[in-house]
Design a protein with these regions (language model features):
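N-terminal Rossmann-like NAD(P)+-binding domain of SDR-like oxidoreductases, especially those catalyzing
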Residues: 1-162
Length: 162
């Protein structure tokens, strides 16, 4: 199975890619390697995936909000699944740089939906965030809990994607 993993250099993306490779899948990883946190750690994760996978791991450093770059990198490649973990993270930073969140978390998400639609990808999994529950004080959160009062732009973008 060939799986596209966005956010492949992040902690969850890296762990997922390792697991998929361990079971024999082919993984195409995408990440923009932004400097929201330590880029060297992200590069180490990509190097580890390459070292452990033979030729079953391919990595593209790109911003999936750029549809031309996304389509170009995946031209001629058939995808069986998409696991969309990539996003501009951080609640506080969303107040300082809202355009980054609109581009990555909204436009980028639409690009991945369109990619899946045009390529007839059978399944796409999206990772949202507990931030969508806003100021909810009930713990643990439940799927039935209200998510209509986001407290940050980050939360609003994640909720919009749901």
């Amino acid at each position: 199975m060939r799986v596209l993993v966005t956010g492949a250099a992040g902690f969850i993306g890296f762990c997922l890619a390792r697991r998929l490779l361990a079971r024999g899948d082919e993984v195409i990883g995408i990440d923009n390697l932004n400097d929201y946190y330590q880029v060297s750690l992200k590069l180490d994760r990509i190097a580890a995936l390459r070292a452990d996978s033979g030729n079953r791991f391919t990595f593209h450093q790109l911003d999936f909000s750029d549809m031309a770059a996304l389509s170009g990198a995946l031209d001629g490649i058939t995808l069986d699944r998409i696991v969309h973990l990539g996003a501009q993270a951080g609640v506080r930073y969303s107040l300082e740089n809202p355009q980054a969140y609109v581009a990555s978390n909204l436009a980028g998400h639409v690009n991945l939906l369109e990619l899946a639609r045009h390529r007839a990808v059978e399944h796409m999994v999206y990772a949202s965030s507990s931030s969508v529950y806003g100021g909810n004080t009930k713990l643990p959160f439940a799927v039935e809990d209200r998510t209509d009062h986001p407290v940050s732009l980050y939360a609003a973008t994640k909720r919009a994607n749901e």
